[in-house]
From Swiss-Prot:
HAMAP family: Ribosomal_uS14_1. This is Small ribosomal subunit protein uS14. The lineage of its organism: Bacteria, Pseudomonadati, Pseudomonadota, Gammaproteobacteria, Pasteurellales. GO terms for biological process: translation. It comes from Pasteurella multocida (strain Pm70). One of its GO terms (cellular component) is cytoplasm.
Amino acid sequence: MAKQSMKARDVKRVKLAEKFYAKRAELKQIISDVNASDEDRWNAVLKLQTLPRDSSPSRQRNRCRQTGRPHGVLRKFGLSRIKVREAAMRGEIPGLKKASW
């Protein structure tokens, strides 16, 4: 089990990313615009740097919903590989069965 503080930190990062999404996209648009003046682009870079670090989507981590495990998380289920296997063996995931060939 992950510490509660680690889970809370990831929740905070998700909220910050949603809050600053529009502003971040607007600044990135200015930075990538070749027709914008160098001064405008430089100011956009400086403004982007002043935004909170945790508002960047790349700082988010997919975690297991049950355990908070950060590695081996299957996006389709939102669970770690271990919990997916346990749930599949109990028959709790419809349509999922053990491979056999």
